[in-house]
């Protein structure tokens, strides 16, 4: 609140009214102009600072917007404006986006900064410094890496940086250095799989070289010496194998040198008894041992096979299979209960037997034989067939060579059929022996009487000494033992009469199989009847 002016009397006793002085010279300071100038300057400086900050902020924002728009346009593949103003404004952003790192980042979006840097170094050089080789001028035939040559030559090779992709076009041989680093090629491979492109050619050839079986991964010192042991191998195989026969094929024996070339670690140390065994696997050694013991394995000759003169050999070999069948028959006969082997039981026992005899044949020990349940089922049928042959006193393989007419008869299940088969063979063998010896069998039937008269005639002619060439030929033909293939080929009169009687009685004669008859028939045709 303003105070009222005070009135002071003058010397004349008059009072003066209060008034405000208008003289600025005494009231205002002397440097009023300087003060005003400083005030104006201070305001200008504040305005300048505010403008600088605002411009810098605007510049930063515009640069950000420019970069974002450039990135969006590059991703959308949108063409830029061709006017002068836009070209001047967009030129810095375009140059920024066209640098090498940005191009590589667009090509490999999943690559890290270190990978992009390595790719950039590769693109600016012909090859990596460790891969750069040059020809020695002194000897002209030695190629050494540049890393080793830098220590010998005082002037190392200077590699000038090139533009992106220039080294691949200017490399010697028409192609650039291949990138074999899996760490670098994995992002590109993933991206190519997403797009659907085929894999790179360099990676394809790299996998092809690494998986080539002709290139051994082991050094030469670990490969067995095939030249020094070739004589021992040839001597061993020559004694064990007489050579392929006309019936068999020798292709299986020609595969052994090829298998020897691919041997790595599954070799067997050589022993004095088996020379050259270090060049073969355990399965091959077992097969060579079997060939040395049995010539039928190498020749395929029917004369050495036990009742198997045709078709392909058994899975484990004919001889080993026959021994296995005999072993299983002995186990079956030793069972007091007379039990029957199932396929699984036979498979287990056969596996144990093969492990004892020739373990190298099985697949779990490096062999080629894989025992299956179907093979065991066939083994059970062969065991039953061999058991019937032993009960009938027949050699091995007789029933299989005679056909499948008698194989359906269960062993011990049809007494009449077993007795008939045994009686027929015993009667026939007795008559043949009597013809050879010149004796006369007891006249039990018309057939025996006929054979006795024939033998008496031959004996009388021999006593009188009036034999001629025709009689000699007849005697030789009578002494020749025919090959029995089926029962019906015997053509015996008493057998024909018996079969006719069975047909009259409706006993059922089906394809050579004789039906069950009563005990009177069994007693009639018993061996001691």
UniProtKB/Swiss-Prot annotation:
It comes from the Eukaryota. Residues 233-248, 443-455 have a biased composition (Low complexity). Keywords: DNA-binding. Residues 179-189, 458-469 have a biased composition (Basic and acidic residues). InterPro entries: Attf-4-like. Residues 19-31, 138-153 have a biased composition (Polar residues). Residues 1-39, 131-158, 173-200, 233-255, 436-476 are annotated as: Disordered. One of its GO terms (molecular function) is DNA binding. Residues 307-319 bind DNA. This is AT hook-containing protein attf-4. It comes from Caenorhabditis elegans. The lineage of its organism: Eukaryota, Metazoa, Ecdysozoa, Nematoda, Chromadorea.
């Amino acid at each position: 609140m303003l105070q009222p002016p005070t009135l002071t009397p003058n010397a004349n006793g008059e009072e003066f009214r209060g008034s405000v002085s208008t003289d600025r010279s005494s009231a205002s300071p002397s440097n009023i102009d300087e003060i005003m100038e400083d005030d104006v300057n201070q305001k200008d400086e504040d305005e300048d600072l505010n403008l600088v900050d605002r411009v810098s902020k605007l510049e930063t924002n515009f640069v950000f917007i420019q970069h974002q728009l450039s990135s969006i346009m590059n991703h959308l593949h949108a063409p830029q404006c061709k006017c002068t103003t836009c070209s001047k404004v967009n030129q810095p952003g375009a140059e920024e986006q066209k640098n090498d790192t940005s191009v590589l980042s667009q090509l490999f979006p999943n690559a890290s900064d270190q990978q992009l840097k390595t790719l950039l170094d590769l693109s600016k050089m012909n090859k990596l410094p460790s891969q750069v080789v040059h020809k020695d001028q002194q000897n002209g035939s030695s190629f050494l890496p540049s890393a080793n040559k830098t220590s010998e030559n005082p002037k190392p090779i200077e590699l000038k940086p090139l533009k992106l992709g220039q080294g691949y076009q200017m490399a010697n041989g028409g192609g650039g250095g291949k990138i074999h680093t899996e760490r670098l090629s994995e992002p590109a491979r993933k991206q190519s799989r997403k797009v659907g492109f085929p894999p790179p050619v360099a990676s394809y050839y790299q996998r092809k070289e690494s998986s080539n079986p002709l290139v051994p991964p082991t050094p030469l010192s670990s490969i067995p010496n095939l030249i020094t042991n070739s004589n021992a191998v040839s001597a061993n195989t020559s004694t064990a194998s007489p050579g392929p026969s006309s019936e068999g094929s020798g292709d299986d024996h020609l595969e052994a040198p090829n298998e020897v070339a691919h041997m790595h670690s599954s070799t067997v140390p050589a022993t004095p008894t088996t020379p050259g065994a270090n060049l073969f696997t355990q399965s091959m050694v077992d097969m060579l041992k079997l060939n040395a013991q049995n010539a039928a394995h190498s020749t395929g000759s029917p004369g050495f096979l036990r009742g198997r003169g045709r078709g392909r050999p058994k899975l484990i070999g004919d001889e080993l299979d026959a021994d296995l069948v005999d072993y299983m028959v002995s186990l079956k006969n030793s069972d007091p209960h007379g039990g029957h082997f199932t396929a699984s039981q036979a498979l287990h026992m056969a596996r144990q037997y093969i492990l004892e005899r020739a373990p190298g044949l099985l697949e779990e020990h490096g062999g080629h034989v894989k025992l299956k349940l179907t093979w065991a089922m066939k083994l059970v049928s062969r065991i039953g067939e061999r058991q019937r042959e032993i009960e009938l006193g027949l050699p091995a393989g007789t029933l299989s060579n005679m056909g499948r007419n008698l194989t359906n008869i269960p062993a011990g299940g049809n007494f009449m059929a077993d007795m008939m088969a045994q009686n027929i063979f015993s009667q026939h063998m007795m008559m043949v022996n009597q013809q050879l010896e010149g004796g006369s069998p007891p006249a039990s039937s018309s057939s025996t009487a006929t054979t006795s008269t024939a033998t008496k005639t031959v004996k009388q002619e021999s006593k009188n000494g009036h034999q001629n060439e025709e009689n000699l030929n007849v005697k030789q033909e009578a002494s020749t033992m025919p090959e029995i293939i089926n029962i019906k080929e015997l053509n015996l009169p008493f057998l024909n009469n018996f079969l006719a009687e069975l047909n009259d009685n409706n006993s059922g004669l089906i394809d050579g199989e004789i039906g069950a008859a009563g005990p009177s028939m069994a007693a009639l045709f018993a061996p001691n009847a």
